[in-house]
Structures are given as C-alpha cells and as structure tokens.
Regions:
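Nucleic-acid nuclease catalytic cores
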Residues: 1-17
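An acidic intrinsically disordered interaction segment
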Residues: 39-61
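Short amphipathic alpha-helical segments and their helix-coil junctions
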Residues: 55-75, 151-153
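Class I SAM-dependent transferase core
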Residues: 64, 68-69, 167-192, 198-200
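Core catalytic lobe of class I
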Residues: 67, 77-97
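Structural motif
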Residues: 70-84, 142, 161-166
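Long recognition/docking surfaces used for binding and targeting
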Residues: 89, 93-178
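Conserved S-adenosyl-L-methionine
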Residues: 190-292
Length: 292
C-alpha cells in the first residue's frame, strides 16, 4: 500500500524483545506450509517477482528512503542523498545481474534474517560492483545496519531497470529539484530551458556533446533522450532491438561528456546517468574553466 510498509511475522517460535527483526518472514506461507526464504524470485510462478512502478509510486518510495536516511538530521541532506545513490546503485546492479528463472534476487530481506547479516550481504554486493566500476563511488556505505534494512524494505519489490525510462527521469528529476533547491539550487537549470536548448541544437548520434559545468547532468540526459528518440525513428524496438540500442548506447558511452567541480553533484550526475542507462563514465569531477 502506498505510504505504508507491511511486515509478516512468524509466531511459531518465541522471540525476545531484542530479537523482533528475526521474527520477520519474507511473505505469508502458502497452504499453511513453511515460509519461503526469499519473497522476490525471477519469473517463478506462485511467488513474487519485482515489478515496474508508476511515477507517483516511485517518487513516494524515493522520498521514504531519503527520510529514513536523513533521520531527522542524523545526516546532512547531501550526505543522505549520497547514501541513497549507493544503495540504488546496488539495487540496479542486482537487477541486471545474470540469473535463471526461479532464482531469487539478492537485494531483499530474507526470512528470519538479522539486520547485521542483511547489511553484510548488501555491503558485499556494493563492494563487488564498486570494484568493477570505480568511476562511480569510491567510499563505503556508511549508514548503520538497521537504517540500511529499512531502505532495502522500501526498494526490494521495485524493478527499477524495467520501470519506464521517462517515469524514472521525471521521478528523480522532481525529487532532486525539490530536495536540492535549498542548498544546491544553482546546479539545476530549469528543464524547460534544457529542453529548448537541446531541441535547438538537435544533437546527432555521431556528434560530441560536452557540458563543462554539467551540474546534475540535465543537458547530458536530455541530449541522450533526444538521440534515443532519433533511434525510435530509424529502428523498430521489437524487430531491430540490437540496432536500436547500439544507436544510442554508442553515443552515451563515446560521445557524451560532462565536467562538474562539486564532487557531491558529480556523484548525483553519474547516478542520474546510471538510472538513465549509462554514459556515467564520461562525467568527471574537475573545474571545467580551469584551463580557460
């Protein structure tokens, strides 16, 4: 249910007051049997698979995650958003990891799993992905185990990878616009101006695009979206999927570049590009006016 978090508890055993989290099970048992170890399994009948969501639900989920991380002032807003970016990075990496039908996702809370063990699994996933892609994050996940557990509970049932690209773009854009307007408003060009500028430039997939002060990556994202729409004109997604992807992905990886002087905003821009399916390796933290 929107805005609420459901918990299923196992009352077949007695748990002490400090052991309540190990009483949580993944889902209600089927036909009065034992509870499943995992709730979310890829494509298997009779159990849950993660699912795409609409814009409003995604915005609400992101806000709940950030409120959990911020904790009424435990972390500064930028630090909380940075931790959220790390966790979303783990979530996307797990969704895109190769797995057979019927295999469970790692990014979820297992039945009777203490916060410590869950946190160890999530941190291990993060470290393995960070090693493969050091361009994105260099720091460890810094939040405590209980907070990490709550954030995982908010995100575990969502399929971010298969959620519509426009939905993700609008949801994260609206969230960041409202969230950063106070401290970092200068880094966010209004999307109407960005859209007008990109439509006027009409970038092609074989041209280079560089934003020397890219902020959160708005110009880069709209340029990528423009080239994606060009791919729609040239190729049919159903019958020419490989050609369609190659058309815009080569542009994202080889022709799209951003420079941002603020390290925190650089991470936001990279996360933005990851959510929009790549191009993040070409965003660097540097003073774009240093050599001028």
């Amino acid at each position: 249910m929107a805005g609420k978090t459901r918990r299923f508890l196992d009352f077949t055993q007695k748990y002490g007051i400090l052991e309540r989290e190990t009483n949580i099970i993944a889902d209600l048992p089927r036909q009065y049997g034992r509870p499943e170890e995992f709730k979310y399994v890829k494509g298997a009948a009779g159990v849950f698979d993660i699912r795409p969501v609409e814009k409003d639900e995604l915005i609400l989920t992101i806000k709940k995650c950030h409120q959990t991380l911020w904790g009424g002032g435990k972390l500064s807003p930028p630090a909380a958003f940075g931790e959220l970016c790390k966790i979303i990075f783990v979530k996307l990496s797990d969704e895109n990891a190769p797995r057979k039908k019927g295999e469970p996702y790692e990014f979820q809370i297992k039945t009777h799993e203490p916060s410590r063990r869950l946190a160890e699994r999530i941190r291990s996933l993060y470290e393995s992905q960070k090693a493969r892609d050091p361009e994105v994050f260099s720091e460890t996940i810094k939040i405590d185990d209980a907070t990490l557990r709550t954030v995982v509970s908010h995100l575990e049932g969502i399929n971010l990878s298969k959620t519509d690209l426009d939905t993700k773009g609008v949801a994260f854009e609206q969230f960041m616009d409202g969230f950063f307007k106070g401290d970092f408003g200068q880094y966010f060009t209004p999307r109407e101006i960005i859209r007008f500028s990109v439509d006027m430039m009409q970038p092609k997939n074989d041209e280079l695009v560089l934003d020397p002060s890219c902020g959160s990556g708005g110009f880069l994202l709209y340029s990528l979206d423009h080239v994606r729409r060009l791919a729609d004109e040239f190729f049919d997604k159903e019958t020419e999927g490989a050609e369609h992807t190659k058309f815009w992905l080569n542009f994202a990886k080889g022709n799209l570049f951003g420079i941002e002087i603020n390290d925190e905003i650089t991470r936001v821009a990279k996360m933005n590009m990851i959510i929009h399916e790549d191009g993040h390796t070409n965003v660097i933290g540097f003073d774009g006016l240093d050599r001028i």
